């Protein structure tokens, strides 16, 4: 069993690492899927450094203020859905960038996939979550 894990484990994690890297590179996307405040994101050098994380923290402060104000306004269901979608894109992309920064600063860390099932009253939603691990610790920067 150890031989199997030693040979195939890096192959399995390689895809999760590639997926997270791709998602982290979506931070300054400039199309209809761009995040809010794209000019602010463009001003940040996204080089997976600790300095870039500090600047992203300023971005997240602007985002929190924006969503706090947006939630104080009356909304139709479509507007609310749009806000949730935007918030989800921000959490996933910034979380992936945070995880990639950790991974690039310390090569012991890798992404792994965790399959989850969420039970609702009428359905079971199956999803895969990327989790960062150094084989002793786990963290979920995208949640």
Segments from the language model and where they lie:
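Intrinsically disordered, low-complexity coil segments
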Residues: 68-83, 107, 117-123, 135-138
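A recognition module on extended beta-rich or small alphabeta surfaces enriched in W/G with H and D/E
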Residues: 41, 120-143
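N-terminal low-complexity, intrinsically disordered segments
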Residues: 1-90
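Aromatic- and glycine-enriched beta-alpha-beta binding-site module
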Residues: 86-124
